[in-house]
């Protein structure tokens, strides 16, 4: 199924098929614009360890390091036009990720929600699932293919379409906090939190459309630091990493740990 899988390695994973959401902003690294090659290498190595552990990995990438449609719409650009430009930015990032992944010997497929036949396959749900079953990393670009929808919503949608076990939101921080830990020394990290509390407290894990999609299908979400070595594999193997957002009424609503 995957690059190095055997029955023992795959059975040890808490999450077998995952949708990894990466922000375009995170690709900036120390730059003010564009793509930091060091960040690409880090992400490629993290995904490789996950695939080697037996996981099926699909990725949705944002485009905020290149173009943010919402911001330009606020400055006067037509919103739909700006959003389509943002979709193109996600494809640039998707191609960069594809190259980085292939440089560490991962087999990839880049799929686009809008037609770009020379550089990407069209998004076809059954084809994407088949790629995952064969151990290929599938990168989804161009968001949902529609304006007015964020790449977080694209991640929720694609995660549901490919029957992912969980949506993993890889960020530059260690999870969801009660306050900004860099500004508030008393800030605590949520170890786990019910999705309704995320909505009620407006914790901005994802936009409301994305959260609603996850809520309706009880799709769990984990917010974690993608830049910490082996975090992705540790998470897949069941270690407590980041913040787990769940929809299970039987679980404790929240659990916090010091930042």
Curated annotation (Swiss-Prot):
SUPFAM superfamilies for this protein: Carbamate kinase-like
Catalytic activity: UMP + ATP = UDP + ADP
Cross-referenced InterPro entries: AceGlu_kinase-like_sf, Asp/Glu/Uridylate_kinase, Uridylate_kinase, Uridylate_kinase_bac
Pfam families reported for this sequence: AA_kinase
Assigned keywords, A-Z: ATP-binding, Cytoplasm, Kinase, Nucleotide-binding, Pyrimidine biosynthesis, Transferase
Superkingdom of the organism of origin: Bacteria
Binding site for UMP: 63, 83, 144-151
Listed GO biological process terms: 'de novo' CTP biosynthetic process; UDP biosynthetic process
Presence of the UniProt keyword Transferase in the record: yes
Binding site for ATP: 21-24, 64, 68, 171, 177, 180
Regulation affecting activity: Inhibited by UTP.
E.C. no: 2.7.4.22
GO cellular component: cytoplasm
Function: Catalyzes the reversible phosphorylation of UMP to UDP.
Similarity annotation: Belongs to the UMP kinase family.
Protein name: Uridylate kinase
Species in which this protein is naturally found: Salinibacter ruber (strain DSM 13855 / M31)
Gene designation per UniProt: pyrH
């Amino acid at each position: 199924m995957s690059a190095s899988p055997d029955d023992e390695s795959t059975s040890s994973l808490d999450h077998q098929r995952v949708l990894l959401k990466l922000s375009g902003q995170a690709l900036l690294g120390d730059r003010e614009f564009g793509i930091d090659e060091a960040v690409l290498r880090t992400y490629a190595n993290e995904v490789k360890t996950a695939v080697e552990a037996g996981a099926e990995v699909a990725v949705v990438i944002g485009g905020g390091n290149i173009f943010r449609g919402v911001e330009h719409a606020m400055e006067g650009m037509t919103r739909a036009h700006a959003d389509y430009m943002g979709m193109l930015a996600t494809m640039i990032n998707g191609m960069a990720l594809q190259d980085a992944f292939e440089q560490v010997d991962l087999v990839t497929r880049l799929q686009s929600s809008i037609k770009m036949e020379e550089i990407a396959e069209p998004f076809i749900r059954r084809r994407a699932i088949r790629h995952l079953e064969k151990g290929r990393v599938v990168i989804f670009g161009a968001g949902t293919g529609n304006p007015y929808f964020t790449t977080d919503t694209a991640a929720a949608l694609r995660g549901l379409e490919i029957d992912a076990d969980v949506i993993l939101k890889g960020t530059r921080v260690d999870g969801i906090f009660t306050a900004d830990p860099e500004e508030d020394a008393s800030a605590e990290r949520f170890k786990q939190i019910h999705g309704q509390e995320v909505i009620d407290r407006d914790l901005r894990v994802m936009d409301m459309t994305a959260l609603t999609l996850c809520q309706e299908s009880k799709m769990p979400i984990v917010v974690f630091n993608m830049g910490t070595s082996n975090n992705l594999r540790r998470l897949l193997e069941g270690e407590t990493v980041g913040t787990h957002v769940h929809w299970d009424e039987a679980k404790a609503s929240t659990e916090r740990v010091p930042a």
